[in-house]
Amino acid sequence: MARYRCCRSQSQSRCRRRRRRRCRRRRRRCVRRRRVCCRRYTVLRCRRRR
């Protein structure tokens, strides 16, 4: 839960945009675990940007 904190903070808007883009690009993996995939990539992107 702590890992997803970044997306729930003020970076949520940025995360949401990246999350949709990333998910659509990796559609094959996202289709099955759409939420997990999106959330995982979102967290990674957010953490690296910070």
UniProtKB/Swiss-Prot annotation:
Compartments where located: Nucleus; Chromosome
Presence of keyword Phosphoprotein: no
Lineage start: Eukaryota, Metazoa, Chordata, Craniata, Vertebrata
A Gene Ontology cellular-component term: nucleosome
Superkingdom assignment: Eukaryota
Record-given protein name: Sperm protamine P1
Major localization listed first in the record, in broad terms: nucleus
Quaternary structure note: Cross-linked by interchain disulfide bonds around the DNA-helix.
Record key words, sorted: Chromosome, Developmental protein, Differentiation, Disulfide bond, DNA condensation, DNA-binding, Nucleosome core, Nucleus, Spermatogenesis
GO function terms (MF aspect): DNA binding
InterPro entries: Protamine_P1
Disulfide feature: C7-C15, C38-C46
Similarity comment: family membership: Belongs to the protamine P1 family.
Purpose: Protamines substitute for histones in the chromatin of sperm during the haploid phase of spermatogenesis. They compact sperm DNA into a highly condensed, stable and inactive complex.
Tissue-level expression: Testis.
PROSITE patterns found in the cross-reference section: PROTAMINE_P1
Organism of this sequence: Equus asinus
Listed GO biological process terms: chromosome condensation; sperm DNA condensation
